[in-house]
Amino acid sequence: MSRPNKEPRYRSGLEKRVCNNLRNRRIKFSYEPYKLDYTKEVKQGFCPECGSKVMLKCHQYTPDIVLDNGIHVEIKGKFTGEMRTKMIAVKKCNPDIDIRFLFQRDGWCTKNHKMRYSEWCEKNGFDYAIGEVIPSEWID
């Protein structure tokens, strides 16, 4: 039997610190409240019935935090290529949902240091912040 006020199991220490900061600021939010559906194209896919080479696979994405104003916040330490591809697909399939990123630091997307996380967000139309605190302007 679980306790009603039991703290959720966070996926990282960063998520826990961000959520604790929101609680300390008395900001209402939900942690991983639901899943959003999205599709990704299957590489080298083939439909045996119609012969189409365009195949889609259904996936689900769980936002880290949803603020009471409807803003979805994805909290990231490391931001891999796989995650970047996934988030573009999530946004494409859910265009009316405001998804933003809170990065622990503005790291490099690639080993050759050609693009930072912030530059990737700007290029792909995502709002973002750097640090461990959700900006006040996202809440007001």
Identify the function of each model-found stretch:
Residues 1-140:
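Nucleic-acid endo/exonuclease domains
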